[in-house]
Amino acid sequence: MSSLSSSSSNVRMDRRFDWVGPPDSVSKIRKIMLRRVDNESELERQYRAAREELNQWNSDFWAEHNQLFDRQKSEFVEKKQKELGRLEHVSANELSEFYRDFLNDRHVAMMVYNKEWYRRNLQLIWPALKVNVVRFFRMARR
């Protein structure tokens, strides 16, 4: 879970706008606090909840991915330094091999993530259209 989620729930927001926070320290994804209008319909609430769930799912994926990357990179660097001697630094070429291998190992997981990300976002198109129609008529009545 995002490190911002517990502290950001206490923030008093201007309800006219969505708020975008700083990048999470682990996932590197910015926390988005979606606005909640006073007269939010059930349709709008469901759409907002679906977007919040998608944002959390995305942040969780990248947090897990980045933690795995950091752990494996540390292990790689430690192993290389034992081979080279403590005073030597791991070269950029050696690190590029690690990056290549890491991405190759994660290829299937990344493809699954991309497919799911597109599926979830495409599923939000119809609810977004319905919510925007509701908001258009609400604004037209003013």
From Swiss-Prot:
The lineage of its organism: Eukaryota, Metazoa, Ecdysozoa, Nematoda, Chromadorea. Signal peptide: none annotated. Belongs to the COA8 family. GO terms for biological process: intrinsic apoptotic signaling pathway. The keyword Mitochondrion applies. May be required for cytochrome c complex (COX) assembly and function, COX being the terminal component of the mitochondrial respiratory chain. Pfam families: COA8 (PF10231). It is a peripheral membrane protein. One of its GO terms (cellular component) is mitochondrion. Its main location: mitochondrion. It is found in: Mitochondrion inner membrane. PANTHER family: APOPTOGENIC PROTEIN 1, MITOCHONDRIAL (PTHR31107), CYTOCHROME C OXIDASE ASSEMBLY FACTOR 8 (PTHR31107:SF2). This is COA8 family protein CBG23705, mitochondrial. Keywords: Apoptosis, Membrane, Mitochondrion, Mitochondrion inner membrane, Transit peptide. InterPro entries: COA8. The keyword Transmembrane does not apply.
